[in-house]
């Protein structure tokens, strides 16, 4: 990781708009994008494909060390295509099953350590937008700018419901809400890299705010931080 490469971290729980803001920011600045959550989703999917128990820390860590994954820009430059063992899994890793599995493997300390170096390798010129949950606290603690997005569990469940409905998934919003609350509890209280804003992070509540307004606030903070 080059100390000269400017890095912006965007952390927060699921459903707060991290992915959208990160992609907009990376596109606006012409920087690289790291979707760290995708790494854990890919690992979780690999574990499922290879019939590895999600609680088997030793096996998951070994799988992480040999994870064959690539992150490629879409043709339109607005997103990331995720390739696992030569297969495009961009859509597969966004399923609710994979999301829940990713949260479980991310709670394993040795697994997080195994993927730490891989994440830091994404820091290359001209700059990096790192989207995740512990980017500003653990992976890139010296980042030039740190953002932490939040939103109510109810609003995040509604956003996730709409997103999955648009993709043709049959989902229950009450179940989504329960899963979000459960995941928040697990992520916030885990021993390894608990979900929390860095001391020097700008915290933005996206509840009831349009994505354009959130983006403008983030961009203003980033420009002030890297100038």
UniProtKB/Swiss-Prot annotation:
GO BP annotations, alphabetical order: nucleobase-containing small molecule interconversion; pyrimidine nucleotide metabolic process
Subcellular location field: Cytoplasm
Enzyme class: transferase
GO CC annotation: cytosol
Name of the molecule in the record: Cytidylate kinase
Annotated source species: Shewanella denitrificans (strain OS217 / ATCC BAA-1090 / DSM 15013)
InterPro entries per record: Cytidylate_kin, Cytidylate_kinase_dom, P-loop_NTPase
GO MF annotations in UniProt: ATP binding; CMP kinase activity; dCMP kinase activity
Residues given in the record as ATP binding sites: 12-20
EC id: 2.7.4.25
Family the UniProt entry places it in: Belongs to the cytidylate kinase family. Type 1 subfamily.
Catalytic reactions of this protein: CMP + ATP = CDP + ADP; dCMP + ATP = dCDP + ADP
Keywords: ATP-binding, Cytoplasm, Kinase, Nucleotide-binding, Transferase
